A protein has these predicted regions:
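Transmembrane beta-strands of outer-membrane beta-barrel proteins
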Residues: 32-38, 61, 70-74, 112, ...
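Outer-membrane beta-barrel "beta-signal"
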Residues: 20, 114, 191-206
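Transmembrane beta-barrel strands of outer-membrane/channel proteins
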Residues: 1, 36-42, 65, 74-78, ...
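Aromatic- and glycine-enriched pocket-lining scaffold segments that form the walls
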Residues: 1-48
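Residues that define the transmembrane beta-barrel architecture of outer-membrane proteins
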Residues: 14-18, 55-59, 66, 106-110, ...
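Gram-negative outer-membrane beta-barrel proteins
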Residues: 28-30, 42-50, 71, 80-86, ...
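Solvent-exposed loop segments that connect transmembrane elements
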Residues: 1-13, 48-50, 82-103, 174-191
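Short loop/turn motifs that connect adjacent beta-strands in outer-membrane beta-barrel proteins
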Residues: 27-34, 69, 118-128, 159, ...
């Protein structure tokens, strides 16, 4: 593996990566703030078998706002990866949680989030935050279906304990997908464009 990111199971790895980010925050006094920014990434991809290299890059623009109890986030990101000396350069292989997944080499990501912070004084519970998160991944290959995710839920904060309870409605979500032969390819060519629903509880202790 590499400290920069991922290693492709076909022997393609990242190297010589550069990241930059610029952001500015507008203070609205007692109302809150709005932060806008842009970021970029540029680096090389190395085929460890052949020694050949090519480039990869990603660019993003984001907005974050806090207005009283309301919190809003918007982001657009674009990524292009050019794996050298591979039979099919339309995808790269990335690993997450011990599973290799094919991901479209060229794709756009659209994401948004809306939440509301509710102070609570009920035993150890200090805050409840209902939220709605949306994301969509569009791919450069016209015949590959988009990945779409709706996440509706709430976060309960109690001291060092954080509990996310949500309903996930998605098309092509890698972890809301049957664990069959299509699981590893939903971020590339094997998204069947079917809506699936899952109930999720995530507990964190910090």
């Amino acid at each position: 593996s590499t400290s920069a990111g991922y290693i492709d199971t076909r022997g393609v790895t990242e190297q010589h990566q550069f990241n930059a980010k610029v952001a500015y925050s507008f203070d609205h006094g007692g109302l809150g703030f709005t932060k806008v920014g842009v970021s970029g990434q540029r680096g090389q991809l190395l085929n460890q078998g052949t020694g050949e290299t090519d480039w990869h890059a990603a660019y993003a623009a984001h907005l974050q706002g806090r207005y009283g109890g309301f919190e809003a986030k918007l982001e657009f990101a674009q990524q292009e990866l050019n794996p050298p000396s591979v039979t099919d350069d339309r995808f790269v292989v990335m690993g997450a949680y011990g599973s290799p997944n094919r991901v479209a080499s060229e794709h756009n990501v659209y994401s948004s989030s809306l939440a509301y912070h509710i102070p609570v004084n009920a035993g150890p519970i200090s805050e409840i935050k209902p939220y709605y998160d949306f994301s969509q991944v569009t791919k450069d290959v016209d015949t590959w279906n988009d990945n779409v995710n709706h996440d509706i839920g709430f976060l309960t904060s109690a001291g060092p304990l954080f509990v996310y309870t949500d309903l996930i409605i998605s098309k092509g979500h890698p972890f809301n997908q049957p664990f069959d032969g299509t699981f590893s390819g939903v971020m590339a060519e094997q998204n069947d464009n079917e809506w699936r629903t899952a109930f999720n509880v995530n507990i964190g202790f910090y």
